[in-house]
Amino acid sequence: MYFTLKIIGIAFILLSSFLFGYGKALAFKNRVLELKRIHAGTLRLKEYVSNCPAEIETIYKSCYGSCKDVEFTNGKIIVKQAHLLKEDCELLKEFFATLGALDLNSECARINLYSELLKKQIISAEKEAAESSKIWLTCSFCVGIGISIFII
C-alpha cells in the first residue's frame, strides 16, 4: 500500500512538472500566434489601402472626428458601403493616429515596411519559441525526476 502511494505521488509530481513546462512552452507559442494575427491584419490593411482609397479617406477623417460616415453593425463597420471588419477599422485608426496627413502611396510603403518587420519578428519568435519550449519542457521534466528521486 505504501509503495503504491509512492508511485502515485511520483506520477503526480512528474505530471505536474510536465504540465508546468508545457504551460510555459505554450506561452511562447501564443506569442507567435499573436504576431501572426497582427501580420494578417496588416496584410488586410494593405489591401484596404490599395483597393478602397475613398473608404480609407473616410475612416481617416472619422478618426479625427471630422466625418460621421462610420457605422458599426453586427461586428462589421460600414463606410460608404464598404464592409470592413471592426478589428481592421481599429487597426486603421491606430495606424492613422500616427499620421499628420493622408497620402495613400506613402502609407502603402509604410505598411509594406511594417509587414516586413513583422515577418522578421515572427521568424525570430518562432525560433525563440522552439528553443524555449524545449528548454522549459526538459527542465521541468528533470525537476520532476529530481523531486521523485528525492522522495524515493
Which residues are covered by each model-predicted region?
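Short, non-transmembrane cytosolic segments of multipass membrane proteins
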Residues: 76-105
